[in-house]
């Protein structure tokens, strides 16, 4: 009832329909509208129509369908392409175990490259056959054939090593011993000038640990980097610790040794001494000069007694 109402309401919606008055018999009606895209008429459809006609005449007709719903959809869709029957047989052969790409006439990238570009790119190497065959075998959707079985054996761990393309292979790495450089070989020695050493020593005498601000100022003044100034102070502190440690070791060694007695002056031997004559007093020398006088005898006046003269 509802369908009849819609049909009676707007007849212009179905311009090509054949309307019957009695009942709801929709069998003789045909709701096929004219093509709405006339621009697509420029495509070549003659080959597809001819291939369809050939396939219709060659194959047995399918089940009958009411004419009201148009022709049924055919399953042999491959007949619409150029060379429909040959392409269908080729695809069927490829699904049965062969390569569909080879059956349909596709060539490998190497053959296509060599055929279409013989002189434009002579320096490009052609792809290896194993790579091309491996890529084409992935298109095979049917049961595995001999080629697929061989490829599976190559992929298996127990089989041979897989053949990869040239661009997929990793470059061989050289021995690390010839390339690795140790930190000792990369070291370089900074030679400081006399002026730089003098200024650094002054700063070290003032403060053994330089501040960040003073380090920046000193580096800008002396034309050095902050890292060089920092390393110089580190080395200078290490040198000072080494000198102090050496001095402490020397002091410990001196304390461990026993103290030696001071050297005594040499004493003269008794036999080696000589008698030195004592000097004579003036009185003794005068008494000795007068003849007949008794030495050591003085007169009452304390003088020398005159000797008696004999006549």
From Swiss-Prot:
Biased composition (Basic residues): 114-124
Localization terms from the record: Nucleus
GO molecular function: DNA-binding transcription factor activity; DNA-binding transcription repressor activity, RNA polymerase II-specific; methyl-CpG binding; RNA polymerase II cis-regulatory region sequence-specific DNA binding; sequence-specific DNA binding
Chief location category: nucleus
Entry GO terms, CC: condensed nuclear chromosome; nucleoplasm; nucleus; protein-containing complex; transcription repressor complex
Region called Interaction with DNA, residue ranges: 185-215
PTM field: Ubiquitinated, leading to its degradation by the proteasome. Phosphorylation at Ser-60 reduces transactivation capacity. Phosphorylation at Ser-281 reduces transactivation capacity and increases ubiquitin-dependent proteasome degradation.
Consequence of changing residue 60 to A: Reduced phosphorylation. Does not affect nuclear localization
Ranges of Low complexity composition bias in the record: 248-257, 285-298
A Pfam entry, by short name: Caudal_act
Biased composition (Pro residues): 258-268
Positions of the DNA-binding region: 185-244
InterPro entries per the UniProt record, alphabetical: Caudal_activation_dom, Caudal_homeobox, HD, HD_metazoa, Homeobox_CS, Homeodomain-like_sf, HTH_motif
Keyword Acyltransferase: no
Phosphoserine: residues carrying this PTM: 60, 281
GO biological process: anterior/posterior pattern specification; blastocyst development; blood vessel development; endosome to lysosome transport; establishment or maintenance of epithelial cell apical/basal polarity; intestinal epithelial cell differentiation; labyrinthine layer development; negative regulation of transcription by RNA polymerase II
Region span, Interaction with 5-mCpG DNA: 227-241
Tissue specificity of this protein: In the intestine, detected in ileum and proximal and distal colon (at protein level). In adult small intestine, predominantly localized in crypt and lower villus cells of the epithelium (at protein level). Expressed in the intestine but not detected in other tissues including stomach, liver, kidney, spleen, brain, heart, lung, pancreas, skeletal muscle and testis. Expressed specifically in gut epithelium where it is not restricted to a particular cell lineage. Abundant expression is seen in the proximal colon with slightly lower levels in distal colon.
UniProt region (Disordered), positions on chain: 111-151, 239-311
Alphabetically ordered keywords of this record: Activator, Developmental protein, DNA-binding, Homeobox, Nucleus, Phosphoprotein, Transcription, Transcription regulation, Ubl conjugation
Motif (4S motif) on chain: 281-293
Subunit note: Can bind DNA as a monomer or homodimer.
Task of the protein: Transcription factor which regulates the transcription of multiple genes expressed in the intestinal epithelium. Binds to the promoter of the intestinal sucrase-isomaltase SI and activates SI transcription. Binds to the DNA sequence 5'-ATAAAAACTTAT-3' in the promoter region of VDR and activates VDR transcription. Binds to and activates transcription of LPH. Activates transcription of CLDN2 and intestinal mucin MUC2. Binds to the 5'-AATTTTTTACAACACCT-3' DNA sequence in the promoter region of CA1 and activates CA1 transcription.
PANTHER family with a match to the protein in the record: HOMEOBOX PROTEIN CDX, HOMEOBOX PROTEIN CDX-2
Protein family membership: Belongs to the Caudal homeobox family.
Official protein name in the record: Homeobox protein CDX-2
Source lineage: Eukaryota, Metazoa, Chordata, Craniata, Vertebrata
